Structures are given as structure tokens and as C-alpha cells.
Amino acid sequence: MTANKRILVVTGGHRVALDDFLGAIAEICHDRGWVWAHATQPTAQAWLNPAHAGCWDAILLHDIPGLSLARGSEPIALPPGPGVAEALVGLLDSGQGVVVLHHAIAAWPAWEGWAEAIGGRFNYRPARLRGEDLPSSGYRMGAFTVEVADSLHPICAGIKDFAIDDELYFAPVLTDRVTPILTHDADMSGELFQDTFDVVTNGLSTGVTCAGHKADGGLHGGHRLMGWTTTAGISPVATLLMGDGPSTFANPMFRILLGNALDWVSSTHAKNKAAAQPFAVPLP
């Protein structure tokens, strides 16, 4: 662990218990001797630019840009504005470490390349990915055990299997793009998951679930992953799917995981590994 790291935390586009979340960030950074700053979308997007490469050791994304959400209305996928995707790809091509947290996997649904960059996507509405038409994703709250899949990975240092009460996703993951580090033991039966498009569009659930989805543990959902790593450009990226609310933010194991993830994506080892295995992120 290296002291004096600089962390940028990005939120916006989705509700979050901000005081609890930022309180957890403050304590994580204080314990590790780091400094941090908070930016909100859409103005935060200006930081996600190669012109600012090197300003931050790690960027934590807990936001959903590219999506218009309002209960009682259909969620609308918005393409990146002029130069936005190019700036993001340029930042990733500079070796910027990134951590994607929870609902941030729903970002930029109109840009397939972003799903490739982070290893998956939560679809608020039916969408197309890798040449397939996919249904909207699902969610449910539940108590489950987070399980360590790679005990040797630095993100899992000091982590043992732990119980948590958080939001689970029934959503695509690109299994050929990710290296699993965490799994979970929750029941992933599609009928347990509320259809997100139904809930958002109607303002509440009308009973539509993910039953009947072609669950395959990958593109069609149903996977048990809770965390993974990947490379985008020459940047190390870590994704943690937990992170819905105050009980998770207060969980000691979650705090260790998040701190470890920020530490790892900003490490020389992770950056060298990513540079040795680059991935060209497709532009829109």
C-alpha cells in the first residue's frame, strides 16, 4: 500500500446515500494516507480526459452517465456527446487506473465499447450487445455471502468470505473479457429478479421478472460474479458489483475491498500488466 495517493470519486445519474458513501471513502482514504476529491456528473466528465492524465492515481466511478432516468418514464439511452468517448478512450490509453462500483456498470448504454472496456453492462432497457438483442436487466435485494475466487489477487488481500445484504444484478457480463476475483452464493433464478425497465417505466413493478431469460452466466445474465478485473486501453480496471447502500458502505470487508481495488489499479504492477496486454476500446 502506497501513501499519498490521489483518488477521484465520481457520482451522479443515480440515487446514492451520499453522506454514507462519502463517509466511507473518507475513512478508507484516511486509513491509507490518501487524499481524495468528489466530482458529480455531468461536470465530472471534464476530468475524464487525457489532458488530466496523471492528476489522479485512481478514479472511482459510482455514476451512470449516458442514461436519463425518471420513475414513470422509459429510461433513455443517450450517446456520448461530441468528443466524450474519444476523451475517455484517450484517458484509458494513458494508463489511468479505474474502479467501477455497483450501478456504474449501467453507464453509457448507447456505446457498446464501454461495456467492452469494463467487462459488462446493466441494461435499464432492452439493448443490443455483441450482435444480440438483449432484454432489460433485473435486480433484487438479498442477503448473501461474498466469496473469494482468487485469494492470491492483491484486491483480495485480507479478505475472507463475508455476509452482506446488498442489491444483486441479473445482467450481462463479458466472460471472455474479465478475470474473476469474487463470486457469491445467492440464488440467481430469473423469477426472483424484478425487470428494471418495467419498474422504471411504470414507477413500480407490475410483476415482470427475468424469468424466461436465456440465462447462461454470461451475455444473457445469471452469473455469480461479484468482482472482476480487466484491461481497457493500457489501463487496469476493477469492477465490484456490491455497493448499494449504507449497510454495505459500513461493512469492514467492503471497505477493505474497495481500498484494495483503488490501490491495485494505481499500482505499477497492474499498470505494467495492462500495458503488456492492451485492449483497444471501440469508439461509438
Q: What is the meaning of each model-derived region?
A:
Residues 6-9, 18-100, 104-108:
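Helical hinge/lid and interdomain linker segments adjacent to catalytic or ligand-binding clefts
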Residues 2-5, 21, 31, 200-284:
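Extracellular ligand-binding/catalytic regions of CAZymes and related secreted enzymes
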Residues 120, 127, 132-233:
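Catalytic beta-strand/loop cores that center a nucleophilic Ser/Cys/Thr
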Residues 33-37, 179, 236:
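Conserved beta-strand segments of alpha/beta enzyme cores
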Residues 8, 99, 179-181, 238-240:
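Hydrophobic/aromatic beta-strand patches that form the interior of the parallel beta-sheet core
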Residues 66-158:
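A glycine-rich, often tryptophan-bearing local segment used as a flexible ligand/cofactor-contacting loop or short
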Residues 13, 104, 243:
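Residue-level signal for short, function-critical loop segments
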Residues 14-15, 247:
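Short strand->helix junction
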